[in-house]
Amino acid sequence: MKINEFIANIPPEIISGENISISSNVFRKIFSFSQLSPNDIFYYLNFGNNYNALHIAKKEFNAKEVYGIHGRKQFLGNHEEGIQNPAINIINKKINEVDLSKATVILYWLTDINQSSDLVLKFEKELKRDARVVTLFSPLGMVLPSRVDFPFILSKHPFYYATNIREQIQAIYGKSCVDFTTSWMLAEKYVKEMEIENTYSRFTIILLSMILWINSWNLKVTCEEYIPPPVESYEGILRMFFNIDLKDMFVRRDTEKT
């Protein structure tokens, strides 16, 4: 199975993050990382199955106001308690229809490339100074993060932008190139911080580290000049034992230098 076929078979709600239930402890880490406080007005964009995040933001971190945004009405049936809870505001609108001008902390689960540029424009237009946007894995667009504890990324408004991908990688990872060891360590940290079950952790680390490195290779920001032996080995493991073929991900030929 080619990687695009593998992804196509994943339900879209999983890709968007809507149908993923995240451990409450992960949200506690995120809120501590973002320094959520009683002075903050918190918005969770596309909160999906994670009403628990809204509850924790209000009850444990005492956020001044809490808003859960979701554009799909059928999804809200899972959150009748929240809809009836006056301390938590549920808004059934698409993100682009919601006024974010009073938000001081925003959590956006996944950075959809197709929405990224539109969201950055919306944030630039509506957010007040010092508003914090928390994303996972990467900032929005070419925004330079204000703070990083991978996979948690915080960007503070007004945003500053990288002039090239290496500058952004330096800000996220602390170095201007990505080697396979770094990719593996980041994948391990993601699995640990997101508290992924041990049953799936090894597979997740292998696949994620490969995707991280291959994407860096295609962008010509790997530290290696050629495809290293571990990448070739894990490509074979994924193909042989998991029936996942990553060949189509390689846009560059292995003879091209970074």
Positions of predicted regions on the chain:
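S-adenosyl-L-methionine
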Residues: M1-P38, K73-S101, E235, F250, T258
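Conserved class I S-adenosyl-L-methionine
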Residues: P38-G48
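Conserved SAM-binding loop of SAM-dependent methyltransferases across substrates and taxa
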Residues: N49-A63
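Conserved SAM-binding motif I beta-strand of class I
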Residues: E65-H70
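Short SAM/SAH-binding signature in class I
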Residues: L100-I113, S117
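C-terminal substrate-binding/active-site "lid" region of AdoMet-derived donor-dependent transferases
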Residues: I113-K175, D179
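Rossmann-like AdoMet/SAM-dependent catalytic core
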Residues: I172-T258
